[in-house]
Amino acid sequence: MGGEVRVLLLLGLLHWVGGSEGRKTWRRRGQQPPQPPPPPPLPQRAEVEPGAGQPVESFPLDFTAVEGNMDSFMAQVKSLAQSLYPCSAQQLNEDLRLHLLLNTSVTCNDGSPAGYYLKESKGSRRWLLFLEGGWYCFNRENCDSRYSTMRRLMSSKDWPHTRTGTGILSSQPEENPHWWNANMVFIPYCSSDVWSGASPKSDKNEYAFMGSLIIQEVVRELLGKGLSGAKVLLLAGSSAGGTGVLLNVDRVAELLEELGYPSIQVRGLADSGWFLDNKQYRRSDCIDTINCAPTDAIRRGIRYWSGMVPERCQRQFKEGEEWNCFFGYKVYPTLRCPVFVVQWLFDEAQLTVDNVHLTGQPVQEGQWLYIQNLGRELRGTLKDVQASFAPACLSHEIIIRSYWTDVQVKGTSLPRALHCWDRSFHDSHKASKTPMKGCPFHLVDSCPWPHCNPSCPTIRDQFTGQEMNVAQFLMHMGFDVQTVAQQQGMEPSKLLGMLSNGN
């Protein structure tokens, strides 16, 4: 009983400071806050048992009242949450549990039922649906090879019964400060079609490609599990899942409207799925997924999968050119739903399909110039993206990594930028174009080479496993200090010092 009382006191404190969703109090700077009414008496045990009455709202906190001392306040909240955690741990199950779709006609590649992992949060009206990534296959030969080596990405037969959420799917406030209490849904990738397909397995088709239909069926099923009362649905994804967000976010919103739930705010979070249809560093034949140029692979894939793209984007291109909509900078301007784009400026998957390999032999000058140009090109495509987070790092995927809170752009972390974006909506479907003071959400690094941001994830030598600082990493790649210092108009010693400090 003592643990429950402490939990109620904590919730009362948070409610007074931040307010729950939909009941935020705004005032001009300097204006005295209204005095809070006296607290109601603590409810009896019977009134707080699960399922009784209306659920308590979740707490995406409004920090307007504590803007001057945010770090101290967050430290206190985290300390309270950690101290109370043992009191409630026995009642909480942090794992997401597997649910195979009841509609067994919506399947993985091999015809086994698709599904999702769910962790419900009865007090929250926010839902986070995450689309897993994992490349794709685009013809019978490389799909057969994929089935032999990566069957988990084509079949549900060996999926575990539970998963533990990490990063933005974590239920730990210290790892996931603003979404920890949301309803979490992890949708495994088993369609190999960048979440675009709509074709079942048949006598003619050895494999089903139903990625887009899987998303729709999961949403339909979740309506009966509490999604019908949602205020916000955030469709998130990494890599192929990030591209899947761009392809499906409007379709999810349209489905909810058709089913009678137009008030649910649908938003997107696309991580590491914003690819460029640029020329490869070295042209190669389109034989397998890794070596095939992005445009060639998607051209072939969209036919093989019977892939679907957003209707408004499709109208921008003539018949047979729908593949263009798989590239973020082309589909983004056509989307109705707001989308937050997270993209490393030097994405490892992009460099792989561009035939730039950064391991083994030192990088040649032509490769180095190609890499720098890639960063400039990608930065340019994000210029008009209202909400973005793009660190100058060599990496791939971030939002479900446990270190996702550590990376910063211009002094702001990704969770903080997402929270600022959340706050910009207030109670509307559209975000304010002007961020609140001290709360930015368009953050793109301006430094020109991989890992010039000191908060980038750790680099390790692939042979020794030893950590490398930025200077060591660039030297390992064959970085010519003299030449680059000359290009930048500075002394080589000064350049090395800047690199060692991560500037």
Curated annotation (Swiss-Prot):
Reaction catalyzed: [Wnt protein]-O-(9Z)-hexadecenoyl-L-serine + H2O = [Wnt protein]-L-serine + (9Z)-hexadecenoate + H(+)
Cell compartments where the protein resides: Secreted
Transmembrane helix among keywords: no
Glycosylation sites: N103
EC number(s) recorded for this UniProt protein: 3.1.1.98
Modified residues (Phosphoserine): S88
List of catalytic residues: S239, D347, H396
Record keywords, A-Z: Glycoprotein, Hydrolase, Phosphoprotein, Secreted, Serine esterase, Signal, Wnt signaling pathway
Tissues where this protein is expressed: Widely expressed. Expressed in lung, ovary, kidney, liver and brain. Not detected in thymus, heart, spleen, stomach, skeletal muscle and bone marrow.
GO MF term set: lipase activity; palmitoleyl hydrolase activity; protein-containing complex destabilizing activity
Leader peptide range in chain numbering: 1-19
Transmembrane segments: none
GO CC terms in record: extracellular region
Compositional bias segments (type: Pro residues): 33-43
Pfam (any one): PAE
Taxonomy, superkingdom: Eukaryota
Gene Ontology biological process terms, A to Z: bone development; negative regulation of canonical Wnt signaling pathway; negative regulation of Wnt signaling pathway; protein depalmitoleylation; regulation of bone mineralization; Wnt signaling pathway
Residue ranges, annotated region (Disordered): 23-53
Function: Carboxylesterase that acts as a key negative regulator of the Wnt signaling pathway by specifically mediating depalmitoleoylation of WNT proteins. Serine palmitoleoylation of WNT proteins is required for efficient binding to frizzled receptors.
Family of this protein: Belongs to the pectinacetylesterase family. Notum subfamily.
PANTHER family: NOTUM-RELATED, PALMITOLEOYL-PROTEIN CARBOXYLESTERASE NOTUM
Name of this protein: Palmitoleoyl-protein carboxylesterase NOTUM
